[in-house]
């Protein structure tokens, strides 16, 4: 009992946690062969097992306060393990979806290459997410081992994702972690944070907010442009912001009325290697974290808060309560953010 009590005392966000394990879980969780649905008093979310996987499935993240949903393909959606440099010398030898074309509007002019793949969200096809029910939260964990690799690289690096949904909150906390089987001078993981924005000439959002670039109107996203052309963040090129927040203000495409902000907040700004916010048929919100030297057997990770907020000030308040964390741990007794 002493060990259990001590463990709970050091949990981050202690007000949301309870030792009253006998109380019923405040979430309704339904599960089929294809998906898991989590429904609480503040939000709903679907996690797919098959098809387009990882994170929260697009269009299913519901804010019960306002009735708005996310406007994209999903939240905290995961791609390849990558590094700087070109694959042109061996591109014809790369299996599957590992070739990385650049010098285009999709990927810009910065040479990058895949170390391992495939892109999990589109190519894994099926994952085995596990539900954890706590006294006042629900959580989902999942993992995947990459099975494609560039010439001279091994397969088998492991990706792990944890998502925790605290009762009564309009957001979830997540963490993505890579345990590497390859060495690299600057390995990074590519994901969508919070997620891309589907729109027709800005009809689904009224603003984008980037903590490193400020407020941006929809008129900036009417024509396609390359990632580095506008609103790009690159560690070592741009100053590291105090908070790393990327958000968009939802808008009802039928009425034009504003809804809540949907934000993705990386709790330790220093882990972000590069972050895009560019138009390519939709607003692409790719984020890459890591980008530092790594050896086989080592790991790197990032932690996020993703969800609905009424104002930028509210985002900042929540961010500041949890800033500096890079990981997340969970079991049936509780959860905690870790540094």
Predicted regions span which residues?
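N-terminal secretory signal peptides that target proteins for export/translocation
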Residues: 1-3
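Bacterial N-terminal signal peptides
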Residues: 6-18
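Polysaccharide-binding surfaces and accessory modules of carbohydrate-active proteins
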Residues: 24, 34, 183-257
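Beta-strand-rich recognition/accessory modules
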Residues: 27-39, 229-339
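Acidic, contiguous internal or C-terminal segments within carbohydrate-active enzymes
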Residues: 30, 49, 129-201
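Acidic-aromatic substrate-binding/catalytic surfaces of carbohydrate-active enzymes
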Residues: 33-147
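Broad, structure-driven detector of short, well-ordered beta-strand segments within folded domains
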Residues: 42-49, 157-165, 259-266
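Catalytic cores of extracellular degradative/oxidative enzymes
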Residues: 89, 115-117, 124-134, 147, ...
